[in-house]
Amino acid sequence: MRIDVISLFPEFIAQCAAFGVVGRAQERGLLELQGWNPREHAQGNYRRVDDRPFGGGPGMVMLIEPLRACLDAVQAADARPAPVIYFSPQGRRLTQMLARELAQLPRMVLLCGRYEGVDERFLAQAVDMEISIGDYVLSGGELGAAVVVDVVTRLQEGVLNDAESAAQDSFEGPQGLLDCPHYSHPSSHAWGDVPEVLRSGNHAAIARWRRQQSLGRTWLRRPDLLDEAGLDKHDRRLLEEFRRELAKGDEESGCTPSP
């Protein structure tokens, strides 16, 4: 996969992408990441990329021409078509489902806004999709771009050493459940013991426990993700057992069962 990032701070993206999974993907030739600075395509001595908004008001707006010239250079660098994605609070919410869609693309262009944003005419003519990574305000789109680069890269075939790592992550699978708890050595510690089932060597029992924990955690922490009506009989039974155990523990501790 190739990802081109248009940003006034392309070095930021390069630094974020130099480590961990994304860094290894580049080393293995599974990801080609290229940063582009629209300032290098601006005209005049000052290479201006922004100006005051029409109608007044605070802040500056990124200009059409430097962005257009930069995008032309991006598109000329690779013949493969690529959607242009802009980061905006008005965009489609980034989810694991959307990440899987993007991961199927051979190439994409990520556009990072700054200041008060980008001239609307450029967005209308050149942008194919707007994405939001959450309902909060950032100083620019670079953090959003770094997030997309990471979530999309780890879904590429051969990037993760263990293919099951991605399949078992939170939000993966047909129900999009949260992940189950994980433990490592030592098995016994002052802060608690590893559940006995995980030390049993019984793979069927371990798989059952993990599925139940995923269902229970999703019900407890992100009920908006859980479609109980869509669960099969096995999953409904596991979830009901989880609830009973939770209620029993709450009663023994004198707490009110939750949620």
From Swiss-Prot:
Keywords: Cytoplasm, Methyltransferase, S-adenosyl-L-methionine, Transferase, tRNA processing. One of its GO terms (molecular function) is tRNA (guanine(37)-N1)-methyltransferase activity. One of its GO terms (cellular component) is cytosol. It comes from the Bacteria. InterPro entries: Alpha/beta_knot_MTases, tRNA_m1G_MeTrfase_C_sf, tRNA_m1G_MeTrfase_TrmD, tRNA_m1G_MTases_N, tRNA_MeTrfase_TRMD/TRM10. Specifically methylates guanosine-37 in various tRNAs. It catalyses: guanosine(37) in tRNA + S-adenosyl-L-methionine = N(1)-methylguanosine(37) in tRNA + S-adenosyl-L-homocysteine + H(+). It is found in: Cytoplasm. It is an enzyme of class 2 (transferase). The lineage of its organism: Bacteria, Pseudomonadati, Pseudomonadota, Gammaproteobacteria, Lysobacterales. Belongs to the RNA methyltransferase TrmD family. This is tRNA (guanine-N(1)-)-methyltransferase. GO terms for biological process: tRNA N1-guanine methylation. Pfam families: tRNA_m1G_MT. HAMAP family: TrmD. The keyword NADP does not apply. Homodimer. Its main location: cytoplasm. The keyword Metal-binding does not apply. S-adenosyl-L-methionine binds at residues 113, 133-138. NCBIfam families: PRK00026.1, trmD. Its EC number is 2.1.1.228.
